[in-house]
Each structure stands twice: as structure tokens, then as C-alpha cells.
């Protein structure tokens, strides 16, 4: 028969290895989730910069229309109109993409919170 003390020691070591594995897995999931949050934050920031750039371009075009282009508006109206429509389209697409990026950021933050909670559970048990 097996020695009961040796068996208990073996079981305790096995249990500790399982706990360590669970903790490492939870920590890896947390690091991954935090990386996804950072990437999502970066995407939102880049999209916001794109929105600001497009808005500036549109404002600059509007300013040029009333100043530089006013004398030649008859000849340039088709070009100005097409450029303005293109900027408006880009701005609208970027705005929708920003909304999607913000939703992705929110989801990444929720996932990170869940990973943090799972890590705490793994460490506390």
C-alpha cells in the first residue's frame, strides 16, 4: 500500500501545479486583453485624428471657395463641388468607422475587466 502522507504530499503538489497553471493562463489572458485595449485605443485616436484632418480640409476648402476661388467660380464649380462631396463622403465614412472603433474599444475594455476578474479568482483560490 501507498504511504498516506506521501500520497497527500503528491496530491498537494499536483493541486499546486494546477493552481499555478490556472494563474499563468489567467495572467496570459489578461495581458492579451490589455494589449487589445491598447490597440483599440490607438485605433480610436488615429480615427479621431483623421476626422480632425478631414474637417480641417473641408474648412480650408470652404475658405478657399469664398476667397481664392470666388473670381473663377464659374469654371471651378464642378471641381469644387466634386472635391467638397468627396471630403464629405470621407468624413462620413470616417465618422462611422470611429463609431465602430469606439464600440470595439468598449468591448475590449469589457473583456479586459473580465480577464482581470478571472485573474483575481485564479490567484485567490
Features from the language model and the residues they span:
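Charge-rich amphipathic alpha-helical interaction elements
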Residues: 1-125
Amino acid at each position: 500500500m501507498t504511504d498516506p502522507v506521501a500520497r497527500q504530499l503528491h496530491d498537494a503538489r499536483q493541486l499546486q501545479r494546477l493552481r499555478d497553471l490556472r494563474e499563468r493562463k489567467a495572467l496570459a489572458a489578461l495581458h492579451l486583453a490589455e494589449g487589445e485595449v491598447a490597440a483599440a485605443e490607438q485605433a480610436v485616436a488615429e480615427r479621431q485624428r483623421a476626422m480632425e484632418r478631414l474637417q480641417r480640409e473641408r474648412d480650408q476648402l470652404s475658405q478657399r471657395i469664398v476667397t481664392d476661388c470666388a473670381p473663377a467660380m464659374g469654371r471651378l464649380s464642378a471641381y469644387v463641388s466634386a472635391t467638397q462631396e468627396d471630403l464629405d463622403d470621407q468624413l462620413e465614412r470616417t465618422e462611422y468607422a470611429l463609431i465602430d472603433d469606439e464600440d470595439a474599444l468598449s468591448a475590449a475594455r469589457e473583456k479586459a475587466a473580465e480577464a482581470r476578474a478571472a485573474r483575481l479568482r485564479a490567484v485567490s483560490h
